[in-house]
Amino acid sequence: MKSNNELCRYVPSMMLFLLFEAVAVTLWLTKDNLFYLLNFSYIGGCLGMGTALFTAGKRYARRFVQLAVGSYMLIYLGVISRENMQIEGFWYYLFLGVFEAATIHYAVAKIFGPLLFGRGWCGYACWTAMVLDFLPYKQPQKPRKEKLGILRYVMFALSLALVSGLFLMKVAHLEQIMFWLFLAGNALYYIAGFVFAYLFKDNRAFCKYLCPVTVFLKPGSYFSL
């Protein structure tokens, strides 16, 4: 009986893995691209293993998932494969009218995903938070500045305006530009993240005040299961 109860604790982790496997197989078959099977199987495997380790009381379980998934998306997908997985990449593929790369990523992790697992993206997979969580202010030392939350909407609007402008002006070599925007955008995110962390004595100050992705995350998180 005790062993059955122990196994039941890991059911959510197994369900999470199976959910990503379902996405992996569906995209692999519908888009006839093996990459989707490997990509989502890897991410789902890391998330399933990490949450299982967390359930088992392993101290660094969440950090393991952050590094495994965040580094993969930043270095392999972003730098090596030259896919802009930032919000600008989402607008880019959306305006092209294709459902791949950043549009799939945003649909799964940031638009519909939060209905199932809330802000799991922020805690387990975000490559910006992955680095910021190494800073010394794990417990916020100052009250939250609610009014500064409007800055995330400014950032959201600026990213939309930037990519819209590039399309409207019919700028050449957009794919290459999006890659450089990915590199520059991440550098700016990290710089802003460090500055805000030290100003507000809070590792996640950037996430609370500047991150434009929260505009997508908040609606689904309110109704999260």
Regions found by a protein language model. Give the residues of each.
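Non-ligating segments of multi-cofactor redox enzymes
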Residues: 1-225
